[in-house]
């Protein structure tokens, strides 16, 4: 069964640039897929469409059981709970500790505090950075920042995990 189903998707920006032109992709649950191409090919727009940061102009798009063409604004946070994203620049919050950066992803979806503490410590253990729980992003190496971004992306047990430039 497809976890991502994109059919004839078109995305044009206001400046006239067409970022996606008739894109059709089907990705099954448990499948790994790589989107490759030169700069400006639309890879980032493709990713941003998957978690509804950008709206598509034409076509159909289903992600983790959500119809992203018809999704209501109030349902977007629940979609994003099911789509974990590791951003190219990590997007860590500089004034928050490692713990707070990861916990924030659970707080915004209304998770209980006791569940947050337990789960944050589990994912920190998983990425091997429990000892950095009180550190701030600027105190971490690039690789450690990436692992914190991964921990944040998986803390809500998403159905889909997306990594933008994962190298």
Predicted regions and their residues:
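Helix-to-loop junction immediately C-terminal to a conserved catalytic motif
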Residues: 51
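Conserved ABC transporter NBD signature motif
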Residues: 59-67
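ABC ATPase NBD coupling module
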Residues: 68-84, 113
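Short helical segment in ABC ATPase nucleotide-binding domains corresponding to the A-loop/adjacent helical element
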Residues: 99-107, 117, 121
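Conserved ABC ATPase signature
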Residues: 136-140, 144
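A short, proline-enriched helix->beta-strand linker immediately N-terminal to the Walker B motif
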Residues: 155-159
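Catalytic Walker B motif of ABC-type/P-loop ATPase nucleotide-binding domains
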Residues: 161-164
